[in-house]
């Protein structure tokens, strides 16, 4: 069935394919809403932050580049605390353990809101195939940038954060 859809869609120029048929999420499209528990078991939805720019970082405690970039995310979280920018770390808990997440955050003084993707549903919805993966989402809920891999330096996080705030 997938092959037939590809054959049918390949007859049209890319810009004429209806947005509903394009695999999402991607730059220029709305970020899919989700609801996940945080470390205190409180349910958090992306839509709770509609109207604010959001940086979503998918990570795991066993991932070396994830661990290397987490201090930059923590520093950015502290620097932008007075703004409407939201920085959220989504742990790929289906590939990690809550105990490892808690140990990592306590050991490294991480205070960024951490959501637990225990089933992997949100990671699949966001097409996360490599960790870390970071989505930069505008105030209107549109994906502005996606960076796969890391570690991201603080300087790049600042550039992206400032762009989201000014947008």
Residue ranges, per PLM feature:
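Structural microenvironment flanking redox-active thiols in thiol-disulfide oxidoreductases
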Residues: 67-108, 118-125
């Amino acid at each position: 069935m997938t092959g037939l859809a590809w054959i049918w869609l390949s007859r049209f120029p890319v810009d004429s394919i209806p947005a509903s048929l394009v695999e999402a999420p991607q730059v220029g499209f709305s970020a899919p809403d989700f609801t996940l528990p945080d470390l205190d078991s409180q349910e958090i939805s992306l839509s709770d932050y509609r109207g604010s720019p959001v940086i979503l970082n998918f990570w795991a405690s066993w991932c070396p580049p994830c661990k290397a970039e987490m201090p930059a995310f923590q520093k950015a979280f502290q620097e932008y605390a007075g703004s409407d920018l939201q920085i959220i770390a989504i742990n790929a808990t289906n590939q990690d353990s809550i105990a490892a997440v808690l140990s990592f955050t306590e050991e490294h003084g991480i205070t960024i809101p951490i959501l637990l993707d225990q089933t992997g549903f949100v990671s699949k919805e966001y097409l996360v195939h490599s960790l870390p993966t970071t989505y930069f989402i505008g105030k209107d809920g549109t994906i502005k940038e996606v960076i796969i891999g890391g570690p991201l330096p603080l300087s790049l996080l600042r550039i992206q954060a400032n762009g989201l705030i000014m947008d």
